[in-house]
Amino acid sequence: MSWQAYVDEHLMCEIEGHHLASAAILGHDGTVWAQSADFPQFKPEEITGIMKDFDEPGHLAPTGMFVATAKYMVIQGEPGAVIRGKKGAGGITIKKTGQALVVGIYDEPMTPGQCNMVVERLGDYLMKQGM
């Protein structure tokens, strides 16, 4: 299965009548492996900050997490594995695998829990595949 198919079929799938606003699979260096049409362009320093938070959980909490200049308040995730952010009625979930970052961005009416489920399920699957 292509990386684009993982984004289209697994991340952008319909959940209880809703779907993510945008999604992507990135390399740890920020290289885009596949993305949805509306996925924002990360800046290199944003990826650096995200990767540092995986290595040093809590790094982003004081300043927030920036994605394409949009600021997300960092909320509880899983240290070293999942970063979650909130911005207004939406948010972001980032799951780190051995080689990739699985990213989902949502807006209401999708819930944070639905976003977490979609992103983390694919991330867990990729980890089991050695990715």
Swiss-Prot record:
Modification(s) after translation: Phosphorylated by MAP kinases.
One of the Pfam families matching this protein, by short name: Profilin
Domain of life of the native organism: Eukaryota
Protein's recorded name: Profilin-5
UniProt miscellaneous comment: The variability of the residues taking part of IgE-binding epitopes might be responsible of the difference in cross-reactivity among olive pollen cultivars, and between distantly related pollen species, leading to a variable range of allergy reactions among atopic patients.
Subunit details: Occurs in many kinds of cells as a complex with monomeric actin in a 1:1 ratio.
Assigned protein family: Belongs to the profilin family.
Cysteine-cysteine disulfides: C13-C115
Function: Binds to actin and affects the structure of the cytoskeleton. At high concentrations, profilin prevents the polymerization of actin, whereas it enhances it at low concentrations.
Alphabetical UniProt keywords: Actin-binding, Allergen, Cytoplasm, Cytoskeleton, Disulfide bond, Phosphoprotein
GO molecular function, one term: actin monomer binding
Compartments, as annotated in UniProt: Cytoplasm, Cytoskeleton
Gene Ontology CC annotations of this record: cell cortex; cytoskeleton
Species whose genome carries this gene: Olea europaea (Common olive)
Motif (Involved in PIP2 interaction): 81-97
